[in-house]
């Protein structure tokens, strides 16, 4: 059953509909395409076409053109709008223009890091350029691999904590990398707010100072969710001018936004049913209707509670369709769950903010 039919059935159910506090249908949007900019090397264009990318969305083309005019950019477009191509194409293209040039990519979660490492690794195999060497350098990186990464990686994926504690204090071991640094990518810029954002801005300040010591002045490519002040935030983080790209050229299907109140247990006293129990009921309905669900919870404990409640209501054959996702899981477990979501094998995942970004 498609989601429209499922929603119609629910909204025509009086018991269900009376708990709908808000319902909005966001209309579909057509894609706006642009041809590949002439600055992209023909070989890279060929590989992109082989991967099914025959043109760029308008915001992707604008980002690439702005970068090649020497500007820093922040891309603030919707989820699944292809923001990663805004930085992966310039980074890959730079290896044709300046073999051995380096790029530093900062991701807030390991899930995002692994996704992009897989993507860059696929390009490295497809492109006839030996200097495309992507690597992850974080807490999961085995110690015996770290020296080789410092010596040869050209596309380094890490997180702010590792940059602060494991890379910048030992910058002399990274002299090759910093001296050739061309691009710095800051993904999910919108999370760097408040005290955390102030700390991160100081890390960026240190990064820029070390780059200058080695004679490098990289451009910054930042991505952000659609917040109110992405350009202002980006400028405060890097203390440089930034061009905002917020006209989303990607297509978007219609989306339903619904806000529910759990039903009353005692209307006179204003006591409602537990939101956790209501959330599990929702998730169960979606699974039985053939849909996939991602449910976010505030704490790790709540994630495990929701998973337990749901599995208690599923049949033995259905229990493996639901999983939790939070910090504390083994790396192999996290990768398995991420793959299960992508493939559609998992029908429901309860997660903390560990899976929220990107």
Protein language model features and the residues they cover:
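Conserved interdomain linker/interface between the two RecA-like ATPase lobes of SF2 helicase motors
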Residues: 219-223, 227, 231-303
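Conserved SF1/SF2 helicase motif Ia
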Residues: 92-115, 129, 212-216
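Conserved helix/coil segment N-terminal to the catalytic DExD/H
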Residues: 139-182, 340
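Conserved helicase ATPase core of P-loop NTP-dependent helicases/translocases
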Residues: 145, 329-352
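Conserved helix-turn-beta segment of the N-terminal RecA-like "Helicase ATP-binding" lobe
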Residues: 112-136, 236-242, 314
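Conserved Walker A/P-loop ATP-binding site and its immediately adjacent core
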Residues: 84-85, 101-122, 225-230, 300-301
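Helicase-associated low-complexity/disordered flanking segments
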Residues: 1-61, 69-72, 132, 319
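Conserved strand-helix element at the start of the C-terminal RecA-like helicase core
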Residues: 102-105, 109-113, 283-313
């Amino acid at each position: 059953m498609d989601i429209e039919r499922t929603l119609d059935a629910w909204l025509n159910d009086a018991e269900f509909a009376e708990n709908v506090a808000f319902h909005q249908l966001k209309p579909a949007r057509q894609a706006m395409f642009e041809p590949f900019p002439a600055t992209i090397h023909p070989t890279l264009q060929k590989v992109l076409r082989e991967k099914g990318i025959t043109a760029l969305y308008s915001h992707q083309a604008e980002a690439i053109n702005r970068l090649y005019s020497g500007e820093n950019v922040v891309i603030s477009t919707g989820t699944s709008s292809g923001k990663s191509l805004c930085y992966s194409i310039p980074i890959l293209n730079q290896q044709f223009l300046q073999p051995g040039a380096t790029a530093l990519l900062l991701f807030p979660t390991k899930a995002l890091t692994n996704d992009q490492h897989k993507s860059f690794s696929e390009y490295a195999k497809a492109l006839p350029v030996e200097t495309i060497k992507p690597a992850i350098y974080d807490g999961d990186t085995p110690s015996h691999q770290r020296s080789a990464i410092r010596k040869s990686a050209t596309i380094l994926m890490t997180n702010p904590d590792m940059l602060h504690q494991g890379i910048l204090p030992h910058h002399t071991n990274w002299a090759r990398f910093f001296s050739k640094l061309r691009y710095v990518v800051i993904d999910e810029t919108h999370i760097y707010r408040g005290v955390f954002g102030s700390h991160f801005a100081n890390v960026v300040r240190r990064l820029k100072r070390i780059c200058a010591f080695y004679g490098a002045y990289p451009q910054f490519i930042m991505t952000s969710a659609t917040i109110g002040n992405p350009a202002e935030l980006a400028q405060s983080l890097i203390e440089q001018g930034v061009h905002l790209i917020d006209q989303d050229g990607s297509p978007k299907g219609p989306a339903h936004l619904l806000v529910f109140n759990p039903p009353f247990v005692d209307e006179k006293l204003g006591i409602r049913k537990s939101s956790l129990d209501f959330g599990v009921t929702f998730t169960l309905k979606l699974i039985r209707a053939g849909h996939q669900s991602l449910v976010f919870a505030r704490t790790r404990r709540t994630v495990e509670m929701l998973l337990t409640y749901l599995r208690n209501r599923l049949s033995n054959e259905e229990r493996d369709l639901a999983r939790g996702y939070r910090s504390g899981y083994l790396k192999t477990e996290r990768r398995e769950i991420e793959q299960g979501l992508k493939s559609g094998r998992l029908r429901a995942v309860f997660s903390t903010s560990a899976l929220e970004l990107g």
